[in-house]
Amino acid sequence: MSFPIERVRADFPLLSRQVNGQPLVYLDSAASAQKPQAVIDKELHFYRDGYAAVHRGIHSLSAEATQQMEAVRTQVADFIHAASAEEIIFVRGTTEAINLVANSYGRHFLVTGDSIIITEMEHHANIVPWQMLAQDLGVEIRVWPLTATGELEITDLAALIDDTTRLLAVTQISNVLGTVNPIKDIVAQAKAAGLVVLVDGAQAVMHQPVDVQALGCDFYVFSGHKLYGPSGIGILYGKSALLQQMPPWEGGGAMIKTVSLTQGTTFADAPWRFEAGSPNTAGIMGLGAAIDYVTELGLLQIQQYEQSLMHYALAQLSQIKSLTLYGPTERAGVIAFNLGLHHAYDVGSFLDQYGIAIRTGHHCAMPLMAFYQVPSMCRASLALYNTREDVDRLVAGLQRIEKLLG
């Protein structure tokens, strides 16, 4: 059965607008994806017809909202094949999820002299929290280097591990290069050495099925807004045995069992001990609708459609003589490039005048820019609503810029 691209595009209202007098070509979904009408309607319905504060409310609206929120927790667990809904923590996004692990697991279990491993392709969100932790605790950060093709050589991992190594933090798919890391094999090697493994799935969950139990990782993190859901909501998956040992990171309402001015505070069980304060309930509802949307389409079908589109895009872009492509041939989601010696910002500005939205800059991956010895790159990202016509518009725009600027 062919992928229903016309129906899919009709589901996303913003795709029908014009930018600078041109039909919009949106190629920036890796930064944040557009929202289907079903997600917009779900949030609107909650605010209009069912809004109430969750937890501890005796009245019907509160009970209904709490039940719906917890149903989404179960839905997320099913979506990534977690063993239990109690392994799912609602956070603001990938960045907060990684910071939670660094500040709760890291500060509780790591000591001076320990070491952790990150890779050269990580987003700043999977670098800076570990650097802050290392500075405070005296922990060493070891960097898994890239190959010339922008990939990780799994045989290089063993050389980074010794009896001080406690944790590996690695992205599943690079937000710049689209490199798809062999996470299952990486996790197996790390676990054999006794490491805890955090996987950044922010660029993966929208492009392929994810099974955290099959991957074997201890933590898995992603954001809703890249999965066609609302902004301000994300997920931290953690194995139950680890979560129950971890102390809270933030204090406040909803994460306690008891509070006494003389006896101190006792904390709720995981996952609720990590969800201080009023949650983004509408965002949680919208995330549930987004998961429903991609599940109905089928992640395997989405993956197959996007891979076909990626192969077409790479073939077309490779015909532009002055264009430099970065990263491996086999990739998912994103295409990083530069056009001659022109600054990425200039290229992006010209494309915007043609109604084409891409991302330009260092993409929160300055170490990766240093690896390629460039200050910035252009990045076009492909999503389930993009088409060959979108790719053709991008190629034509780049050829026009090439002709104008030389």
UniProtKB/Swiss-Prot annotation:
Coiled-coil portions: none
Active site: C364 (cysteine persulfide intermediate)
PROSITE patterns: AA_TRANSFER_CLASS_5 (PS00595)
GO CC, any one term: cytoplasm
N6-(pyridoxal phosphate)lysine, modified sites: K226
Reaction equations catalysed: (sulfur carrier)-H + L-cysteine = (sulfur carrier)-SH + L-alanine; L-selenocysteine + AH2 = hydrogenselenide + L-alanine + A + H(+)
Cofactor(s) this protein requires: pyridoxal 5'-phosphate
The keyword Lyase is annotated on this UniProt entry: yes
Gene3D superfamilies: Aspartate Aminotransferase, domain 1 (3.90.1150.10), Type I PLP-dependent aspartate aminotransferase-like (Major domain) (3.40.640.10)
CDD domains, sorted: SufS_like (cd06453)
InterPro entries associated with the record: Aminotrans_V_dom, Aminotrans_V_PyrdxlP_BS, Cys_dSase_SufS, PyrdxlP-dep_Trfase, PyrdxlP-dep_Trfase_major, PyrdxlP-dep_Trfase_small
Metabolic or biological pathway: Cofactor biosynthesis; iron-sulfur cluster biosynthesis
Keyword Cytoplasm: yes
A GO MF label: pyridoxal phosphate binding
Localisation per UniProt entry: Cytoplasm
Disulfide bonds: none
Keywords: Cytoplasm, Lyase, Pyridoxal phosphate, Transferase
EC number, as in UniProt: 2.8.1.7, 4.4.1.16
GO annotation terms (biological process): cysteine metabolic process
NCBIfam families in the record: PRK09295.1, sufS
Subunit-structure text: Homodimer. Interacts with SufE and the SufBCD complex composed of SufB, SufC and SufD. The interaction with SufE is required to mediate the direct transfer of the sulfur atom from the S-sulfanylcysteine.
PANTHER family: CYSTEINE DESULFURASE
Role of this protein: Cysteine desulfurases mobilize the sulfur from L-cysteine to yield L-alanine, an essential step in sulfur metabolism for biosynthesis of a variety of sulfur-containing biomolecules. Component of the suf operon, which is activated and required under specific conditions such as oxidative stress and iron limitation. Acts as a potent selenocysteine lyase in vitro, that mobilizes selenium from L-selenocysteine. Selenocysteine lyase activity is however unsure in vivo.
Family classification: Belongs to the class-V pyridoxal-phosphate-dependent aminotransferase family. Csd subfamily.
Record protein name field: Cysteine desulfurase
UniProt organism field: Yersinia pseudotuberculosis serotype O:1b (strain IP 31758)
Gene designation per UniProt: sufS
